[in-house]
Amino acid sequence: DRDSCVDKSRCAKYGYYGQCEVCCKKAGHNGGTCMFFKCMCVNSKMN
């Protein structure tokens, strides 16, 4: 589900978010980034 990676992958506000990106990709998203210590998945299916 969309927010599954948020709870799973805590990350620094600025810095490493590799686990977040991997989690999001496994969940079917294009990747992920870190905002305010939370993982946010990026999904580009708007084409």
From Swiss-Prot:
Expressed by the venom gland. It comes from the Eukaryota. Pfam families: Toxin_17 (PF08086). InterPro entries: Ergtoxin, Scorpion_toxin-like_sf. One of its GO terms (molecular function) is potassium channel inhibitor activity. Its main location: secreted. SUPFAM superfamilies: Scorpion toxin-like. It is found in: Secreted. One of its GO terms (cellular component) is extracellular region. Keywords: Disulfide bond, Ion channel impairing toxin, Knottin, Neurotoxin, Potassium channel impairing toxin, Secreted, Toxin, Voltage-gated potassium channel impairing toxin. Disulfide bonds join 5-23, 11-34, 20-39, 24-41. Belongs to the ergtoxin family. Gamma-KTx 5 subfamily. The presence of a 'disulfide through disulfide knot' structurally defines this protein as a knottin. Reversibly blocks Kv11/ERG potassium channels. This is Potassium channel toxin gamma-KTx 5.1. It comes from Centruroides sculpturatus (Arizona bark scorpion).
